[in-house]
A protein has these predicted regions:
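Mid-to-C-terminal alpha-helical segments outside catalytic/metal-binding sites
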Residues: 158-168
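Short, ordered loop/turn segments at secondary-structure junctions
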Residues: 90-92, 118, 148-149
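Extended substrate/RNA-proximal surfaces in nucleic-acid metabolism proteins
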Residues: 3-113
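Short acidic/histidine-rich active-site segments
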Residues: 138-156
Length: 168
């Protein structure tokens, strides 16, 4: 679990802004957070301390081991609060592979999906790529993003974007 609070993310944003200014780079830096559905998330939700994207989009993620038992109610509660949940990298949750109908249930319940371009590029494996492509074919993908953590990820994305796989 990452402590994605306004304080921790805000201080990181300020440090980045300072480094960019010191380098002479003039760009606007805003912040949000990706929230794993866990106890910290529940506390931040109740305290109304969640950082959202424009238009009240909120990035949520499941643990990789198993779906949270309260996922359906979290999706509902977020919408009741006027938030628009985006479930990030759903293609990486292997517990859905044997139950792909669960993707449609979640999407129909109001969870938008953001797949990871690294999955499409094969950066996480064949299963993740296959599921990402299936989600696209079924019209369940609302956004494409990335968990770009290092230069190797950038290289994988560059190769993918230059490939015939991307062009189809």
């Amino acid at each position: 679990t990452f402590p994605n609070t306004p304080e921790t993310v805000g201080s990181a944003r300020e440090a980045l802004k300072k480094a960019l200014a010191d380098d002479g780079t003039d760009i606007v830096i805003e912040n949000s957070a990706e929230y794993r559905i866990d106890d910290l998330f529940a506390r931040e939700l109740e305290a109304e301390r969640l950082m959202t994207l424009p238009n009240n989009y909120i990035l949520i993620e499941n643990p990789f081991v198993r779906e949270p038992g309260n996922l359906d109610s979290v999706i509902f509660d977020l919408q009741v609060r006027g938030l628009r949940p985006i479930l990030v990298h759903p293609e990486r949750y292997s517990y859905y592979y044997k139950h792909p109908e669960r993707y449609e249930v979640l999407h129909n319940a109001g969870a938008m999906f953001q797949i990871n371009v690294l999955s499409l590029a094969g950066g996480y494996g064949k299963d993740e790529r296959k599921i990402a492509e299936m989600l696209i074919e079924k019209g369940l993908v609302d956004f494409v993003g990335t968990d770009l953590h290092n230069a190797a990820h950038a290289d994988i994305i560059d190769r993918y974007l230059a490939s015939s796989d991307y062009l189809k």
